[in-house]
């Protein structure tokens, strides 16, 4: 079975990148966010929800007024 030169080249590049990769170290940020997980997601969804409500309510009110005026 013959190995293609492209896959052989990519394999060599990956191996060399792993061997010569610098050591990394995780550092804590001073301004780490205290909220994480579902609390953070709920906060973002609340902000997005309020923006949507502020944009949609006036439009919905216009449609409701138009439909009520057409019925009369």
Swiss-Prot record:
One of its GO terms (molecular function) is toxin activity. It holds the Pfam family Pilosulin. It is found in: Secreted. GO terms for cellular component: extracellular region. This is U10-myrmicitoxin-Tb1a. Keywords: Neurotoxin, Secreted, Signal, Toxin. Residues 27-36 form a propeptide. It comes from Tetramorium bicarinatum (Tramp ant). Belongs to the formicidae venom precursor-01 superfamily. The keyword ATP-binding does not apply. InterPro entries: Pilosulin. Expressed by the venom gland. Residues 1-26 form the signal peptide.
